Amino acid sequence: MAADAPSRRGLGRGSRIKQGRDFRKLRTAGQRMVRGCLIANWLHLPGAERSRLGVVVSKKVGGSVVRSRVKRLLRESFRLHQYELAQPLDLVLVARPSIAGRKFADVERDFLGTLRAAGLLK
């Protein structure tokens, strides 16, 4: 498998944003775009070797099963397309309630549309 191809497994620890301070930094210092069922906050990381993803899904979206599914769909969209990003960045995706019940293709289309509109893809 090529070095830049998506792996078959999920995102590793180094590819996820977990700390509250990182989420706050993106919210205050990062750029923001609202499109479709997603809100994207991002901050470019010059010199970083990989991009990282954080996902926020509130209880307004649905119960725990729905929220977990939405998180999986967003992480998978990022995993498949992370090598298409123009440069490494921290990206936080906030799911809006309209995402509940959507199929993977719809979520992926909104994800790519958001990144494309923000100029984050190669």
Label the predicted regions:
Residues 1-122:
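Positively charged, solvent-exposed patches that mediate nucleic-acid binding
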